[in-house]
Design a protein with these regions (language model features):
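Bimodal "functional hotspot" detector
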Residues: 2-353
């Protein structure tokens, strides 16, 4: 299979609520660009400006940025936000762009592939009461066994990015699927993000007395990075999922996983996190800083990004507020203060053309 690769940079923008920035992290996985331009930063100073910008985008936009869950060179299912043609059928189009050798071929970042078998037709998608029922053609069955779980994750996580979709029902030629065609993976009546993504099976064997949480680590190629969601199971005895998420991030990526983290092993919460009005407030020890001798009290951008992405997988959490020993005097790697709560970006790993 040959792909036409255009110049791109994968970016992830984390918005600081008081400024609504467009500040981005330059990411260019597996690309051959010799020099990376600094990311653009656009500040919206007030609600009137924001309204004007939104109106302008509606008038001129010929594309709509959509998260497609693709497979990377390490076999991870990864969100890549791509500019797709503007359409009223965004959910159907998103799944059509998961088909190998389809229209996504012109957009794929180097090293990424779509997962649905070539020539698969999305016959229909019906969204009712938060449930998306997807009917595929018979070509959906033409996949390798090792991609079965990845295919499920790709479809379910791509569709559930949309606010109107909470669960997914799969059909082939109008017939509901109760199991996948090749390796017979059982399928529940309604598939949600609870199926996990890039699930690590070695962490906890007791499935009945555990539940999934998803945390984000960093994959890199040379000097560029992008974020990879990983599902781990934690004991039901862990009643506080915010603490559980932080603990898993501190544990770090599994050895040999080709993933990385900026969380120090001696980093720790010094208070029980508080969640209220959509904001998770966390107070860490001084090991949150990139260096204990740094007078600017700098915090790694990769750490903040991974923390916010991981915690906001919980729909009750929209923003994350971070302090060190009770102090909000933190600085991002860009030199800007991190005193305000940080929001999840609208899209993750954006491919910029």
């Amino acid at each position: 299979m040959k792909w036409k690769i255009k110049g791109f940079a994968l970016v992830s923008s984390i918005a600081i609520t008081t400024l609504l920035t467009g500040c981005t992290l330059g990411l260019n996985p597996f690309g051959e660009k010799e020099k990376m331009d600094p990311p653009d930063v656009n500040y919206v100073k007030n609600a009137k400006d924001l309204k004007n910008e939104v109106g302008k985008s509606k008038e001129t936009a010929k594309s709509i940025t959509t998260e497609l869950y693709l497979v990377d060179k390490n076999g991870y299912v990864v969100p890549a936000s791509l500019p797709l043609p503007n359409t009223q059928s965004v959910a159907k189009q998103a799944i059509e762009y998961l088909v190998q050798d389809g229209p996504v071929s012109e957009l794929l970042p180097n090293g990424f592939q779509a997962l649905l078998p070539a020539e698969t037709v999305v016959k229909s998608i019906d969204v009712q009461n938060g449930i998306a029922t997807v009917d595929f053609s018979k070509e959906f069955k033409n996949y390798k066994a090792e991609n079965e779980t990845r295919m499920l994750q790709s479809v379910v996580w791509t569709l559930t990015q949309f606010d109107s979709i909470g669960s997914v029902v799969l059909r082939i030629e109008g017939k509901p699927l109760t199991e996948m065609p090749v390796s017979k993976t059982p399928i529940s009546n309604k598939l949600t993000r609870q199926i996990g993504i890039n699930t690590e099976t070695t962490q906890l064997a007791d499935v009945m007395n555990s539940h999934p949480i998803t945390v984000y680590f960093v994959a890199s190629n040379k000097k560029v990075n992008y974020y990879v969601p990983v599902t781990r199971r934690v004991s039901n005895a862990s009643s506080n999922d915010v603490v559980a998420v932080v603990n898993e991030l501190i544990k770090g990526a599994t050895v040999g996983s080709n993933l990385d983290s900026d969380f120090a092993s001696d980093l720790a919460l010094i208070d029980t996190p508080v969640v209220g009005n959509g904001v998770a407030s966390l107070n860490f020890n001084q090991n949150l800083y990139t260096s204990l001798t740094d007078k600017n009290k700098t915090v790694s951008k990769k750490l903040i990004d991974a923390l916010v992405l991981s915690l906001t997988e919980n729909k009750a959490i929209k923003q994350v507020s971070v302090t060190v020993n009770g102090s909000k005097e933190l600085t991002g790697e860009d030199g800007k203060p991190l005193s305000a709560p940080v929001s999840r970006p609208n899209k993750v790993n954006t491919v910029a053309f």
